[in-house]
UniProtKB/Swiss-Prot annotation:
Keywords, sorted A to Z: ATP-binding, Chaperone, Nucleotide-binding, Phosphoprotein, Stress response
Protein name according to UniProt: Chaperone protein DnaK
Up-regulation conditions: By stress conditions e.g. heat shock.
SUPFAM superfamilies: Actin-like ATPase domain, Heat shock protein 70kD (HSP70), C-terminal subdomain, Heat shock protein 70kD (HSP70), peptide-binding domain
Family: Belongs to the heat shock protein 70 family.
Organism expressing this protein natively: Klebsiella pneumoniae (strain 342)
Amino acid sequence: MGKIIGIDLGTTNSCVAIMDGTTARVLENAEGDRTTPSIIAYTQDGETLVGQPAKRQAVTNPQNTLFAIKRLIGRRFQDEEVQRDVSIMPYKIVAADNGDAWLDVKGTKTAPPQISAEVLKKMKKTAEDYLGEPVTEAVITVPAYFNDAQRQATKDAGRIAGLEVKRIINEPTAAALAYGLDKEVGNRTIAVYDLGGGTFDISIIEIDEVDGEKTFEVLATNGDTHLGGEDFDTRLINYLVDEFKKDQGIDLRNDPLAMQRLKEAAEKAKIELSSAQQTDVNLPYITADATGPKHMNIKVTRAKLESLVEDLVNRSIEPLKVALQDAGLSVSDINDVILVGGQTRMPMVQKKVAEFFGKEPRKDVNPDEAVAIGAAVQGGVLTGDVKDVLLLDVTPLSLGIETMGGVMTALINKNTTIPTKHSQVFSTAEDNQSAVTIHVLQGERKRASDNKSLGQFNLDGINPAPRGMPQIEVTFDIDADGILHVSAKDKNSGKEQKITIKASSGLNEEEIQKMVREAEANAESDRKFEELVQTRNQGDHLLHSTRKQVEEAGDKLPADDKTAIESALTALETSLKGEDKADIEAKMQALAQASQKLMEIAQQQHAQQQAGSADAQASNAKDDDVVDAEFEEVKDKK
C-alpha cells in the first residue's frame, strides 16, 4: 500500500506532510518552502501558476489571480458572506446555473473545487517528488465548522486533482493529533483555537491514554467559516484607502492594480506589526492624476491596527463560550490551549485567548504546520503505520428534516461523535397521501427556512391511509468524513428511497468526471509545455555557442560554410519563437549538420591552445630550476 499524504488545504497557505516511519515530516515544495500560498493564476499565454509564482505576478494580473477560494467552496452565490466578497475581490465571482458561487476565469465559469484542485495537484506533486513514486491517496483537512456541502466540495476538489480522499478530518482535530501523539501527556483536555486565513474554529478535545492507546475525543466544536486573516487584511486595506482619499482626493478602490499592490503591502504591514510597534506602508507611484504621479506613505501603529480589528478578535470569543458550554466544561477544566493558523501570531489574539482561558497558550506547536502533520498522522492510522491511536470526531451542526408547520426536527444533534446512525418514524400530514418529500436540513434554528438546506428527495407509492397512520422511517447515517447518507422507508409497503447528500449546491458526478478529464488533459499539456521549454533552452544554448564559434573561427571558416551556418541560425531563431518542439529539434539538427566544418576548426583551435599551454608550462619549469638554500636567522645580541 502506498503512502497516504496529509494535506492542509488552507485559505491563505497550504501544506503537505507524510509519515516517515513513526514521525510526520512536512515537505518542501519546488520553491524550497514548507508552505505554499493557496493562490492560482491564469496567465495570458494559457499557463496555470500555483503558489509563489502566482503570488509574484498578482500585481500585473489581478483579475485572473485567484486567492481565498476556500471561502467560496460549497457556497451559494446569494449567501451573505459571498456577497460581501463580491464587492471587495479583484476577481469576478458569478452565479452558476445551479445557484452556486463560481468564478469567471477569462470568460469561463469555473467551480471553486476545480480551482482548489490546482493547489492540491501542487501538494501531490511535492509529495511525489520527495517519495519518487506516484501518490494517489490523501487525508485532507477542513474547518471543523464546515457544513456538508463544503465537505463534499473539498472531496470533489481532491478527485479532480487525481487523489482518492481517504478521509476528511477537522483542522483542530488534526492539530490535536500533531500535538498529542509524541507527548507523554496522560489524560488531558485541550482547547484548539484555530484562526486561519479565512475560517475560525474552536474545538474542545479530550486526550485519554489507556494501556498505551491514545484516544482523541472531540467533545464540542464551534466556529465561524467566514472569519480569518483575510478579514483582518481587508480592515487595514480599507483604512489605508480612506486615509489616501482624505489626503489626495483619489479613491483607489476603482484601480485593481493599485488595490493588488495595497493588498500585498497590508498583509506585510500586519505581519510586521506582530513584532514591531509601528511600520510604514510606502508605495511609490500607487496611482496618478492630471497633476502627476501619487505616492502613498502612511505610518501604521500596532495600536491602530488593533483598534481596526478589535471586533473581529472579539467575534472569536463567543464561540469559545458556546463550545465550553456544549462540552459541559468550565475554563478551569482546560489543561492546555493550542493556537493554530497564521493569524494567531498577532499579539492581540494571543492576549485575548490567554485572558479568556486564564492561561498562556502553548508555544511548542507550529501554527502553520500542525494541521498537515495531523492529517499525515491520520493517513498513517489508515495504512496501519501508526498504531494505538483512535480518533473520535464530531458533527459540527445538527442534522434533521423539515416537518409540519415548517419546523426543523433534528435527528442528529450537533457535537455527536461520528460515524453515527439514527432513525426516527414520521407519518403523513394528509389523508390518503401517496408521497412525502424529505427535506434535509443542517443548522441550529427551529424554523426550517433559517437552516442550511442540504437537499431533498421524494418517497412515492405510500398506500392510501388516514393521516398519521403510515409509518415512514427516516434514517440519517454520517460517515467518518462527516458526509451524510439519508434513507426513507415506508414500513407498510417496504418501499425505500436513499440518497447521499450532495447538497443542492454540489457538483454532480458528470461535472466531476468532466473536470477530472480536463485535469488529466492539462497534466499532459503541462508535460508537453515543460518539454517545449527544455528544447527551447537547448536551442538558445546552441544558437549562442555556434555564433561564438563562428566569431572565433574568423577567416578560417570557408565562405560557403559560413553562409550555410548563418541560414541555419536564422531558421532556428525563427523556430524558437514558435510552439513546435519537433520543428525546433529539426532546425537544431540542420544547424549541427551545417556546422561540421566549424566543429573541426573549433577542435583544431582547442588542440593548438592545449599544445601552447603545455609549451608554456615546460618553459616556466626551466626558469624555475634554481637551488633552494637553507639559512638560519641570527639575532643580534643587544
